[in-house]
Swiss-Prot record:
Major localization listed first in the record, in broad terms: cytoplasm
Cleavable signal peptide: none
UniProt-listed Pfam families: cobW (PF02492)
Organism this protein belongs to: Methylobacterium nodulans (strain LMG 21967 / CNCM I-2342 / ORS 2060)
Name the record gives this protein: Urease accessory protein UreG
Gene assigned in the entry: ureG
Record's subunit section: Homodimer. UreD, UreF and UreG form a complex that acts as a GTP-hydrolysis-dependent molecular chaperone, activating the urease apoprotein by helping to assemble the nickel containing metallocenter of UreC. The UreE protein probably delivers the nickel.
Residues noted as binding GTP in the record, renumbered to the chain: G15, P16, V17, G18, S19, G20, K21, T22
Keyword Nucleotide-binding: yes
């Protein structure tokens, strides 16, 4: 049961379409559900597909997964007008008063997407090696200012000609001392490291 007077830790997970946000949500749910009382909120523009995928994967019981249809720019629903997501958080807290952790996945967006501090206490940003080794040096708030940068699909690097050493050097240059992790989430690689970061940085 959460002991924080501020309520459960809220972790925002952002990143472009197809980068691996839902895979990270699934991995974190499975890694943390035995130790913490948690739920998941997903954002899609016109469907609740990501929520359905999490349910089918058995990440959490169906009642602990809520899909939000943003009906427009997914960036707006996590930043400029986060009211629809704040309402979802409030509803989950009503259903499960003992929550320790709420994971909030944004809809796919560009590198400029960021979470409102009103919505997320901790932010994870997922990028995809298949997008090319140039992605880290393109910058953007998600890459430079997220609490943890997740560089996913490392297994695809040889197939797309991406040099992970170059990506790491660019990541260090763009992020300074902020942490990052390389993952291959579909293979289960790196999930525990991300989960450990959430627990430690989030004070769980």
């Amino acid at each position: 049961m959460t002991t924080s007077r501020h309520g459960p830790l809220r972790v925002g997970i952002g990143g472009p379409v197809g980068s691996g946000k839902t895979a990270l949500m699934e991995g974190l749910c499975k890694a943390l559900r035995a130790r913490y009382d948690l739920c998941a909120i997903t954002n899609d523009i016109y469907t609740k597909e990501d929520a359905r995928l999490l349910t089918v994967a058995g990440a959490l019981p169906e009642e602990r997964i809520m899909g939000v249809e943003t009906g427009g720019c997914p960036h707006t629903a996590i930043r400029e007008d986060a009211s629809i997501n704040l309402a979802a958080v409030a509803e989950m807290r009503r259903r499960f008063p003992a929550l320790d952790l709420i994971l909030i996945e944004s809809g796919g967006d560009n590198l400029a997407a960021t979470f409102s501090p009103e919505l997320a206490d901790l932010t994870l940003y997922v990028i995809d090696v298949a997008g090319g080794e140039k992605i880290p040096r393109k910058g953007g708030p998600g890459i430079t200012r997220s609490d943890l940068l997740v560089i996913n699909k490392t297994d695809l690097a040889p197939l797309v000609g991406a040099d992970l050493a170059v990506m790491e050097a660019d990541t260090r240059r763009m992020r300074g001392s902020r942490p990052y992790v390389f993952t291959s989430l579909r293979q289960g690689e790196g999930v525990e490291e991300v989960a450990r970061f959430v627990v430690e940085a989030g004070g769980l």
